[in-house]
């Protein structure tokens, strides 16, 4: 049993690894933010943060960090229509009808950091419904119009889970020189 308090979980190693790619000081959206572990991370790096979750208790907990929006994004309208962010972070959440809204929320030169459960997870735990598990290569397909900087798909042992994760940039550079995306800090 975990001794970490709910809402105090550490930043995802994937999110931490790629945070340096976000433009300095850009606004960051944490979608399905829960109790704000990634909002805390980006706020500590000097980013203004916006979190969306349907749980009013979670939103109350994160409201001191930045903009906190309580919304049922699966059954209601997208609450950020017309707004864009330099960083969009999604972890442990999948609702396919939102793909176009998520991608439209990414500003030019903005970075998408996405990590969630994948096919095979049903053999080791929850979530196990196919609706909540990415199919092989699905994030690559969704991000085909973005510049993919990193992608992983596979199994992690502690705790056991099948994951798919991607870091992708909405490039605005039309120069002949390719943009350098550092693979580490």
Range-by-range predicted roles:
Residues 1-23:
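S-adenosyl-L-methionine
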Residues 25-34:
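Conserved class I S-adenosyl-L-methionine
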Residues 78-87:
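A short acidic, Gly/Pro-enriched loop at the edge of an enzyme's catalytic core
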Residues 106-108:
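Helix-to-beta-strand junctions that scaffold the AdoMet/dcAdoMet cofactor pocket
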Residues 110-119:
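Conserved beta-strand signature within the Rossmann-like core of class I S-adenosyl-L-methionine
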Residues 131-145, 150:
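Short alpha-helix
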Residues 156-185:
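Core SAM-dependent methyltransferase catalytic element
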């Amino acid at each position: 049993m975990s001794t970490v308090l709910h809402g105090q979980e550490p930043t995802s190693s994937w999110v931490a690894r790629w945070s340096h790619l976000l433009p300095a000081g850009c606004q960051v959206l944490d979608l399905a933010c829960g109790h704000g572990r990634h909002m805390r991370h980006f706020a500590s790096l000097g980013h203004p943060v916006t979190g969306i979750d349907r749980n009013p208790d979670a939103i109350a907990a994160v409201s001191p960090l930045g903009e906190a929006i309580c919304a049922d994004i699966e059954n209601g309208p997208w609450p950020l229509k017309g707004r864009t962010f330099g960083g969009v972070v999604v972890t442990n959440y999948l609702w396919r009808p939102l793909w176009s809204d998520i991608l439209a929320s990414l500003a030019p030169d903005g970075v998408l950091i996405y990590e969630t459960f994948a096919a095979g997870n049903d053999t080791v735990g929850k979530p196990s419904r196919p609706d909540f598990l990415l199919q092989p290569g699905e994030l690559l397909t969704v991000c085909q119009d973005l510049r993919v900087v990193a992608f992983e798909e596979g199994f992690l042992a502690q705790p056991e889970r099948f994951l798919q994760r991607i870091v992708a940039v909405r490039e605005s550079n039309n120069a002949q020189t390719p943009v350098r995306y550092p693979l580490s800090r």
